[in-house]
Amino acid sequence: LAIQSAADINKPEKIFFHYEFEPQGEWWEKAKPLLTLNKVKAPESFMGRPLYHVAHKADVVRLQVLKETGGIYLDLDTICVKPLHGLLNNSFIIGQELKPEYVPKNWRQEIKFAIRKKTGLIKSNQVNGLCNAALLSEKNSPFVNLWLDTYSSFRSKGRDKYWNEHSVFVPIKLAAGHPDKVTLLGPYAFHYPLYNKPGL
């Protein structure tokens, strides 16, 4: 569904699927004709720092590919509901991620949050960070280069307290220091509903 929605809504010339191990199964066989496959070797380390978890290896691969080619990166669970063409004139785009406690749990909160969404009144203390599940980038974007350079301080060993440091917190710090190199979209642009129980 995610791949089909990306194809139908955005109508790209090609959809590149970067992988180390090719998926299998009925749904993969249905999606495969939509894709241009690109087999990669996931890095064991980057900038002299070991990458222990597959998610962190994937984080580095997506940034390296965007640096080399530019384009749109979407996680495999991203469902496109609107085309992204209108955003392609920016050097780099990333969306904010709400803290899980700010996901509406009932209809009253949904109305309240809808009003905030329309008026742009999302408070900064409600934003968890930036999320790398959907990224748009020009080739060799200055922001991608800055982000990749921060991996010299990468320290996560897996699902530890540094798990999302480089995927969520580092980019928001970079964006604060280099607002001219990045376009930030609100939390409802790419990352809603959230990954918590009510969102799922």
What are these regions (language model features)?
Residues 1-58, 76-200:
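Glycosyltransferase-associated regions of secretory-pathway enzymes
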Residues 59-71:
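Small-residue hinge/turn detector
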